[in-house]
Swiss-Prot record:
The protein's name in its UniProt record: dCTP deaminase
Biological role: Catalyzes the deamination of dCTP to dUTP.
SUPFAM superfamilies for the chain: dUTPase-like (SSF51283)
GO process annotations (BP): dUMP biosynthetic process; dUTP biosynthetic process; nucleobase-containing small molecule interconversion
Similarity section: Belongs to the dCTP deaminase family.
Enzyme type, top EC level: hydrolase
Active site, renumbered: E136
């Protein structure tokens, strides 16, 4: 497997892999600095949309991935999301992805957030998966933490195999195929 360059990412985006797409790096908006997004040397920095689900413990339930209670989250829409101390929030990317059959995509958090104790987690985007990426932001600090909508939050790395997979995510009817918006756990 080899990592794909900015040139490859631009060509793949022209074929519909990433929508909307930014061909370069955006570092400013409205005259001020932002957390960067867009194409980098060997990756693509995605933006966080303005839809959030903030984890709350008001119902004092047990977190069970097989029977997840939607009431464990408070829905929020806005330019800035405040994550409570030692808690987390779900969000989604602005970008919609269509991953080629020969590609596996790995997501890593941006250092701007990591250096503040905010960790971004996303599982790999498998071959022929498509949808908005659901992002998990963990606030590992004892203080409230801000996430900025419309700005960079994570970087996607594209790895292309020297052999096309026998069965893709689409072929096996993956449960998150075509997801839109913030998607909760499914079994």
């Amino acid at each position: 497997m080899s990592i794909k360059s900015d040139r490859w990412i631009r060509r793949a985006a022209e074929a519909g892999m990433i929508e909307p797409f930014e061909a370069g790096q955006v570092r400013t908006a409205n005259g001020g600095r932002i957390v960067s997004y867009g194409t980098s040397s060997y990756g693509y920095d995605v933006r966080c949309a303005d839809e959030f689900k903030i984890f709350t413990n008001i119902n004092s339930t047990i977190v069970d991935p097989k029977q997840f209670d939607e009431k464990s989250f408070v829905d929020f829409k806005g330019d800035v999301c405040i994550i409570p101390p030692n808690s987390f929030a779900l969000a989604r990317t602005v970008e919609y992805f269509r991953i080629p059959r020969s590609v596996l995509t790995i997501c890593l958090g941006k250092s701007t957030y990591a250096r503040c104790g905010i960790i971004v987690n996303v599982t790999p985007l498998e071959p022929e998966w498509e949808g908005h990426v659901t992002l998990e932001f963990s606030n590992t600090t004892p203080l409230p933490a801000k996430i900025y909508a419309g700005e960079g939050c994570a970087q996607m790395l594209f790895l292309e195999s020297d052999e096309v997979c026998e069965t893709s995510y689409r072929d096996r009817g993956g449960k998150y195929q075509g997801q839109r918006g913030v998607t909760l756990p499914r079994t």
